[in-house]
Every structure is written in C-alpha cells, then in structure tokens.
A protein has these predicted regions:
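Bacterial N-terminal signal peptides that target proteins for export
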Residues: 1-11
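A bilobed periplasmic-binding-protein/Venus flytrap-type ligand-binding module shared by bacterial periplasmic
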Residues: 36-59, 190-202, 265
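Flexible hinge/capping segments at coil-to-helix
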Residues: 183, 194-211
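Extracytoplasmic small-molecule ligand-binding "clamshell" domains
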Residues: 53-80, 94-173, 177, 213, ...
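A structural signal for short loop-to-beta-strand junctions that line the ligand-binding cleft
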Residues: 30-38, 42-46, 94-98, 128, ...
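A ligand-binding cleft/hinge motif common to bilobed small-molecule-binding domains
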Residues: 22-39, 156, 167-178, 223-225, ...
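Secondary-structure junction motif
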Residues: 211-229
Length: 266
C-alpha cells in the first residue's frame, strides 16, 4: 500500500511539473502577425524653426548616403535598406557657411525603440540612430550628447533650448509648422499587429476593441486609416516591448508599430 501511495504521488508530481512546464512554454512561444498597413511616412530630423543646423545635418546625411553608410546601417539593424535620403557627394562644400569644428550638441532621442534607439546597461545609447549620429559627428568634427525626450513634446523641447535637434523614429508631421525638418532619411510604414492565434484578421474586425500605441505618430496612423472612430479605446505604453507584452497578455487586442522594426519583435 505504501509503495502504491508513493507511486501515485510520483505520478501526480510528474503530471503537475509537466503542466507547469508546458504552460510556461506556451507563454514563451506566443507569436504575432501583421494584419494591415495603416500609412507610410519618412523619418526626419527636427530642428528649431529656421536653425542653420538643419542644412548642415542634411548635407552631412547626403554625403553619408552617397558613401553608402546609411544603407549599410539600415541593412545591419533592420535587415533591409529603407534609405530615402538623397545621395550627394561633397554636399557640405556647397553650404554658404561651413560648420565650425568642436561644437557639442544635445540630441533628443527615444528610448526603448530597439533596434533604432535604446539605452544600454551602462547608460549609453545604441542602435541605428546613435550609430548614424556618430558618423555625422565625425564628419563635422562635433560631439553629441543624447537626452531622452517624449516624441510628442519635440517642439517644446526645441523651443526651450533643452535640445538642439530631435532625431527619432518619427516624421514629426504634427510639428512641421513649428520646427524645421530635414528631408526624409528612412522610409517606414505603420503596421497593425495582433497575436497569431487571434481571431482578428482585418482592421475592420477590431471595431470596439483596445489598441496599444506608444506615441502620437501611431495615433495619427490610426486617424489616417479611419480606425480611430471605430476602435473602443487606445492605450498608451512606454515602449514597444511594453506594447508587445500587453498584447501577449491579452491586455489589448492589437498594437500599432513601426514596420521597419516589426521583424525585431515578431
């Protein structure tokens, strides 16, 4: 009888462990799928209205585009070349006023937008934008200091002098009247993403549902597609990792993300 009890206890324990392990595994293997593209945009760099820095940065980026450096970084971080900046060798030499070396600029960036821009454990920043900014700094003989800001507050941050420019995964379309923008340097689409096991297969099927976003550009994409009037509510999350965690947990029904980084999270 004792042997039978021990055997039954062993079987019960083994079954419980199996259920726990398979339960954990199911959470770890959650997958996602894109069901719609909402809009297209081009990422820009934002400056104070009329600031000559805009022309200087644009010229430096045109030279880096001509050198193939932007294409290289795009392929390295995103797997595809999404570059749209004009390639113009010697663009800096065409400026009426040449940039003086030795300047130190404060650049407003986003955090938590891997692999575009995110902080490391040591407090430094890594990703496509910081690497490209470093190439611009080397070309101009300048140094850059990065400051994390909210992409919805770009005009205010520039106007206060807190930053010299804002370099983010954003088109700044909502701020174009109050800031100067470089030409677009990277193409992007906003995508609507759901869990792969979701019953939602089209954007129209999300009527009355909860959509997760990270910033105003994603909200603009919802408005441009006409979805803002159909969904139940829109919830803001701190970054894309938080967005996907909420989607995986079922806290929201879909998320709007930048298509260029979808492969990193999906």
């Amino acid at each position: 009888m004792k042997k039978l009890r021990r055997f039954l206890a062993f079987v019960l324990c083994a079954a419980l462990c199996f259920l726990l392990l398979t339960g954990c595994g199911s959470r770890d293997t959650i997958r996602f799928k894109m069901i719609a593209e909402l809009n297209q945009e081009e990422f820009c760099v934002a400056f104070r209205k009329g600031d000559p820095l805009c022309d200087i940065f644009t010229a430096a980026l045109k030279e880096l585009s001509a050198d193939g450096q932007i294409s290289r970084l795009s392929a390295q971080y995103l797997g595809t070349d999404y570059t749209c900046m004009e390639a113009l060798p010697g663009a800096l030499q065409l400026l009426e006023t040449q940039p003086e070396p030795g300047r130190k600029l404060r650049i407003g960036v986003q955090d938590g937008i891997a692999p575009i821009s995110s902080s490391r454990d040591d407090g430094s920043f890594g990703g496509l934008i910081p690497d490209l900014a470093q190439l611009v700094a080397e070309k101009l003989g300048w140094t850059f200091e990065y400051m994390v800001i909210n992409s919805d507050n770009v005009a205010a941050e520039l106007g206060s002098g807190n930053i010299d420019c804002a370099w983010m995964a954003a088109s700044f379309s909502g701020s174009s009247s109050s800031v100067s923008l470089s030409p677009g340097w990277l193409r992007n689409t906003h995508e609507l993403v759901v869990r792969s096991d979701s019953r939602y297969a089209r954007k129209n099927s999300l009527k009355g549902k909860v959509i997760g976003i990270t910033d105003a550009t994603a909200l603009s994409a919802l408005k441009e597609s006409g979805m803002d009037a159909k969904v139940g509510s829109v919830w803001y999350y701190d970054d894309l990792s938080a967005c996907f965690a909420a989607l995986a947990a079922g806290d929201c029904d879909a998320v709007v993300i930048d298509g260029i980084v979808s492969g990193y999270y999906m």
